[in-house]
Amino acid sequence: MISPDKQYETDTNLYNPSEIEKKWQSIWTENNLYKTDELTENSDKFYALSMFPYPSGNLHMGHVRNYVITDLIARFQRFKGKSVLHPMGWDAFGLPAENAAIERGISPSVWTKKNISHMKSQLKLLGLSVDWDREFATCDENYYIWTQYLFLELYKAGLVYQKESEVNWDPIDNTVLANEQVDSEGKSWRSGALVEKKLLKQWFLRITNYADELLKDLEKLDNWPERVKIMQDNWIGKSIGTNINFNINTNPEKKITVFTTRPDTLFGVTYLAISINHSLIKNISDQETIQDIENLKQYLKNNKNNELEKIGIKTSLIAINPVNSEPIPIWVASYVLDEYGTGAVMGVPAHDLRDFEFAKKNNIDIKHVIIKDKSEKTKELDEAYVENGYLINSNHFNGIANTIAKLKISEEGVNNGWAENKIQYRLRDWLISRQRYWGCPIPIVNCKKCGSVPLNQSELPVALPKDIDISANKINALGDNYNWINTTCPKCGIAAKKETDTMDTFMCSSWYFLRYPSSRCSTKPFEKIEINNWLPVDQYVGGVEHAILHLLYARFFTKALRDNELFEIDEPFKKLLTQGMVQSAAYKNNKTGKYISPSDINDLSNPTDPIDNSKLEVLFEKMSKSKYNGIDPESVIKKYGADTARMFILFKAPPEKDLEWGDSDVEGQFRFLSRIWKLYISCSKDINSKSKSYPNKEKTLIKSMNIAIKEITNDISNNQFNTAISELMKFYNSLSNNINDVNNNLKIDALKTFCILLAPFAPHISEEIWLLIGFKNSVHLEHWPSFNAEALKEDSYVLVIQVNGKVRDKININNEMNEDQIKELTLKRPNILKWTQDKEIRKIIIVKGKIMNIVV
């Protein structure tokens, strides 16, 4: 039972959110109101989770939107009687924390913990129904010991390996990036630096072992946004095709392999294109060609962020087409990627847009091998023909539909040994090595005798050294820490060195959702029974920018750990909501390209640059310090209260759409809550006194109350929070118009129902008005109301009246009227008499509730 020591003063009509919210947050904490219920056999569970934040030090409005959405869903499910797990933690490792700590000359650990403390206090201001007893940070030793444990589990399963590889190197952050962390312009997703290529020995996870399952199981994710599934589908990039082996004429034992999905065009190949680093290049002896290739390498390096020109360098190498033994020149081309397929592609200019452009530019032959219609005569092509059709100039395959020829040519190649059916993926193994201090150490020892040796699980954790040297704008790498790096080999016992790379931070976030159900377990990363009971996450909320990073890695981890028999689930997240960005007005001078702070603008209704008086363009863009359009959540809460901030965030736009910040809209929600406050203050003064009741008013209120219950329940269930608040407003209008003219039982029932419906959206004021109308326990311990279908039935309906099938009138008919009464009422109406008077009525057909047809 919750009975606060201090009740809010009810002798004022002024709504004071700061006092109300502070009071109730304290009560919730004291009473441990949001502690997760233990699951029983009869429990109906709901696991609600927001993507956990990186502790940057301050909440921004994007955070607020994410956590308020999840909190609303968690509260709603709790009202519906479910055992709810709604935890929070911190994604605490990574370069931003290390760089920020270096700037301040302090340890990343100190910096991170300070930020966590501040952000936690900010989150609590929002009134989130979080079970804080389950909180952890990924930089805690008692968390990353289990990240290391799971690394070793994956190692034992053959999913971890080390190899020398050309990697993406960030020259600003001095670390390796996974392919997914390099944007379309070739820049680091963190620092924005142009990414370089570097050869290093690195640790990888075999995510490609699960490529097919990751792709196929997207079909199971019915409650994921389609665009996220498409992004993952494209990233995995399954291609079903054929590897074709071309002999090299100067060396019959040497072959070049090309992957293609179009073996039907093999007779149209007029050149092969290879990448700048293809192994065949070492067979080129002409110095001029070698220099041209070096120049091309430099061009590609310098223009990673620009649209590349399709440059080609003809070599002296000649391949032999296996289908007709024709010689084919080999070119080095700027558009061929080392990392995709075999680093070589066949050029079919007649039937590929890119190849056509390349051939025209470099005077390469164009050979037409597919026509649209069998009767069509061949002619010189003005553009590539890329549709289906029939083969020509293809020996014994002439006249065959190209879709059939694909299979036949491929089959002939397989039978004759120059082709192999192949499934290929764009997805590459996950590179997890990072060359920085602030990350989870890799539990491997490097021994001169035994090589790379995994530690025994009993030797975990490999803790980060605390005696770090912060100087020269960097934290010395783990390899420079003599006291830390030196150890003994767990296999042979001789002197050895610890692995000095740390893990990609996505290693920590790929399993954190598995830790919450048993976050205090000290003997293993999680209890199998708890995972099988609580997982998958029923509702996951976070940004779409994580579609091909965190979300893909988390799915991989789940499947890999399932195969290690650590639990039985296949997918981690049942339902995914990707919220839109929070945007705010930014003022841009298009002449200078600079953004101007609103505080420097005299008149925001007609904004001009205070320096050159140029008219400023007003743009709604993602909140950012550089654009001077950030809104501090704490200042909004201080001025209007957390409930107002929550209501605005939930009302302004559907959750998956971008939200435009508007002060007037925030004030509108504050006024709405103030009106609710005044109504309940007024009602509380005579809550038990009998007032005169009016049946029509009672009927109206009962109906609006049941409509609200039905619509708000459906809207929250479908993540339509903005329309749910619209229904709340309609119910409030009916409540305020009718509450003083209904019987006392209905009055209390309606006030009680409105309070419960409001509670997931505005949890603090709901607690206070719940007390005002005489209830002692927390409103958040109540059950969600059910609507009464009978109350939604209309007293009357509109009857359409036809004469000989043509509409002549409409009339409101009481539901209780029978057919004789309906006939008597309608046949007297002037609009009907006009068409029936002095005529014989042969038949009257009535479809009750809809239509009446008079046949004359």
Swiss-Prot record:
It comes from the Bacteria. It is found in: Cytoplasm. It comes from Prochlorococcus marinus (strain MIT 9312). It catalyses: tRNA(Leu) + L-leucine + ATP = L-leucyl-tRNA(Leu) + AMP + diphosphate. Belongs to the class-I aminoacyl-tRNA synthetase family. Keywords: Aminoacyl-tRNA synthetase, ATP-binding, Cytoplasm, Ligase, Nucleotide-binding, Protein biosynthesis. A motif ('HIGH' region) lies at residues 53-63. PROSITE patterns: AA_TRNA_LIGASE_I (PS00178). It holds the Pfam family Anticodon_1. A motif ('KMSKS' region) lies at residues 622-626. ATP binds at residue 625. Its EC number is 6.1.1.4. GO terms for biological process: leucyl-tRNA aminoacylation. GO terms for cellular component: cytosol. It is an enzyme of class 6 (ligase). This is Leucine--tRNA ligase. The lineage of its organism: Bacteria, Bacillati, Cyanobacteriota, Cyanophyceae, Synechococcales. GO terms for molecular function: aminoacyl-tRNA deacylase activity; ATP binding; leucine-tRNA ligase activity. Its main location: cytoplasm. InterPro entries: aa-tRNA-synth_I_CS (IPR001412), aa-tRNA-synth_Ia (IPR002300), Leu-tRNA-ligase (IPR002302), Leu_tRNA-synth_edit (IPR025709), M/V/L/I-tRNA-synth_anticd-bd (IPR013155), Methionyl/Leucyl_tRNA_Synth (IPR015413), Rossmann-like_a/b/a_fold (IPR014729), tRNAsynth_Ia_anticodon-bd (IPR009080).
